[in-house]
Regions:
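RecA-like P-loop NTPase motor core of helicase/translocase proteins
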Residues: 1-190
């Protein structure tokens, strides 16, 4: 007999964090899942709003959450900060489903600081997957750990019409960034 964890879907502080992230893209058109960039067969996350609109959304979210308002836009780098043990991993995994539901986003890269955190993230993904499948009507989702030894996975990641989540450590990203941008025979020269 296997033990199944029960998740509380109604913790206000978690829902507030998820909603804040989703609101960053307020005004974004929902991406049509049938659209594919036929030149390369890529299924992208295509933004229909610009950085100025995202910056205005950011300031609204900061005001709503009573945190200091940014004076300038410093790029598309956002963080949700929560205390240890409050469900950060649950929040960002559920945020993936919400961003897909509201905007049709399908490509996500989770960059973690260490191998231990990567392994914990993979385990959390497995533990929560069945629960999220019930909550989000069995939306197809695939999670894979990035490995420079399996560079062809990046092509699969970009071509898939499912929600794709790539989990990578910060060190792998920094070390392998040149590999990602270098033509590879295994990667069909792209």
């Amino acid at each position: 007999m296997t033990m199944k964890l029960q998740f509380d879907h109604s913790k206000k502080f978690q829902l507030d964090a998820i909603e804040s992230t989703v609101k960053l893209f307020e005004g974004q058109q929902k991406f049509d899942a049938s659209f594919v960039d036929f030149v390369d067969g890529v299924v992208p996350n295509k933004l229909t709003i610009n950085e100025n609109e995202i910056f205005e959304n950011l300031k609204d979210i900061q005001k709503q959450n009573k945190i200091p308002i940014s004076e300038s836009f410093e790029g598309m780098n956002f963080s949700i900060e929560m205390e240890t043990g409050t469900g950060k991993t649950y929040v960002y995994l559920r945020t993936i489903y919400e961003l897909n539901k509201k905007y049709g986003f399908k490509k996500f890269i989770i960059v973690v600081p260490s191998v231990a955190i990567r392994e914990g993230t993979k385990k959390n993904f497995e533990i929560t997957k069945d629960d999220f499948q019930i909550l989000y009507n069995k939306i197809p989702i695939q999670s894979t750990e990035y490995s420079s030894k399996n560079i062809s996975y990046i092509r699969q990641f970009s071509n898939s019409n499912k929600i794709e989540v790539m989990i990578i450590t910060r060190d792998s990203f920094n070390k392998d960034v040149n590999i990602m941008n270098t033509p590879q025979d295994k990667f069909y020269g792209k």
